[in-house]
Amino acid sequence: MEELKHECGVAMIRLLKPLEYYEKKYGTWMYGLNKLYLLMEKQHNRGQEGAGLACVKLQANPGEEYMFRERALGTSAITEIFEAVHSNYASLTETQLHNAEYAEQVLPFAGEIYMGHLRYSTTGKSGISYIHPFLRRNNWRAKNLSLCGNFNLTNVDEIFEKITAKGQHPRKYADTYIMLEEVGHRLDREVERLYAKCENEGLEGMDITYAIEDQIDLANVLKKTTPGWDGGYVICGITGSGECFSIRDPWGIRPAFWYADDEVVVLASERPVIQTAFNPSSNSIKELLPGQALFVNKKGNIRTEQINLPKNNNACSFERIYFSRGSDKDIYQERKQLGKNLVKPLLDAIKNDIDHTVFSFIPNTAEVAFYGMLEGFEVYLNQLKKRYLTTLKNGVSEQELEHILSMRIRFEKAVIKDIKLRTFIAEGNTRNDLAAHVYDITYGSVEPYSDNLVVIDDSIVRGTTLKQSIIGILDRLHPKKIIIVSSSPQ
């Protein structure tokens, strides 16, 4: 079996109004920055190895910076990058802090386009240089490019050979760098095509720049690069001239959702984080379809376009089982159903002995499947009570009735997660030492030597933790039998 690899998280925001609008309506021009923080923090489950953000300022004069980036490593990376951004504003007066025009002209990260990334490595490579977003700089605004993504390409070698055959010399052999150079190369060619066109039309100087930025079409860039990408991906990008895009793989392996109103366009890896941050109805949030791209140009015009033909749907099942937050309405019901599916095999395992069985779950992601499992057992128990009552032909004594009505599913919080450690990303002795201390138990939750203990997990990802910590510590409760079940695979 292939080693489990986590998925990253992405977030992108395009403000459609001037910063002054948000200052007046929401009391701060930092509306976009604050919303990006919320989107990233709500997707912290997707990446604890590092985080980064990028920003583009649409209104900047030559000689002024217009593209900004901040990155950090570690589980506190989100806090660190936003603290670094806000450190630029620490010395401002209250008047300056609420002056949107001043912010737009002077302050870094006071822009209209924001992009954030949460990283879990799928390659084993680590270090700040591997933290997204990546930047490709140029003196032409339209040639500046920042990329981030949630992806795992299977043909990196092939892409590397393709771009080196054209004469490029990538500075690193890493998938994101290679994608950055490939997209950047095509972006350069698109800008140069438009430059030649504008020159032929008699334009000069900054008029050429403005014409290029008005006419550039990133769909042309993606149509010449992404067909050669094999694997699952959601790639987000912003240019220095104010275009932004996101594209999804044609198999629909990696997820992306987006929402737009008259104030903002937002995209994220998960639907409920958009609901939480912006409070739209779930029906107004759209899924980015397989092979489809979302574009917002410099003027704020929004469109989607089918860049690659969709292929057989191969959406990542583990995304719905484990990676995503369980607060998505569809994922919540799916995880509950996975728990319900376990009722029959569990009844066989405990020999229908409900009275002497305690049910619990391994926190925290297995909780939803646990609720589904309990609902399934409640249905079974109600059927059992009904059968008992209908078989008692001579009436029911008060004692018999009391016994039947008192029958219940016994559930306890037998397992406690003390500290938030991901043991499957550690190695060797460190991995075992960590696993031994991640979980604890609730003493007295099981009748020793009498009760069966059934514990549900949501996946097989915690194989090391089960072996090194959970089973051993559950045994301290002295149950008659320990049964560990997985909601997926079953």
Give each language-model segment a name.
Residues M1-L289, F295-V358, I362-P363:
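Conserved short alpha-helical segments that host acidic/polar catalytic motifs at enzyme active sites
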Residues N152-T154, F361-A369, I460-T464:
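Gly/Ser/Thr-rich loops at beta-strand to alpha-helix junctions
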Residues I163, W251-I253, D261-D262, M373-Y380, ...:
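Short secondary-structure boundary/capping segments
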Residues R171-Y173, I178, N220, L384, ...:
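Catalytic or ion-translocation cores adjacent to nucleophile or general acid/base/metal-coordination motifs
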Residues G228-G231, E334-D355, M373-G376, A426-Y449:
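Phosphate/ATP-binding catalytic cores across multiple sugar-kinase/actin-like superfamilies
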Residues G300-C316, F361-S397:
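Terminal amphipathic helices with adjacent charged low-complexity linkers/tails
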Residues E375-N452, T464:
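Short, glycine/charge-rich flexible loops or terminal/linker lids adjacent to PRPP-binding catalytic cores
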Residues N432-Q490:
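PRPP/pyrophosphate-binding module of the type I phosphoribosyltransferase fold
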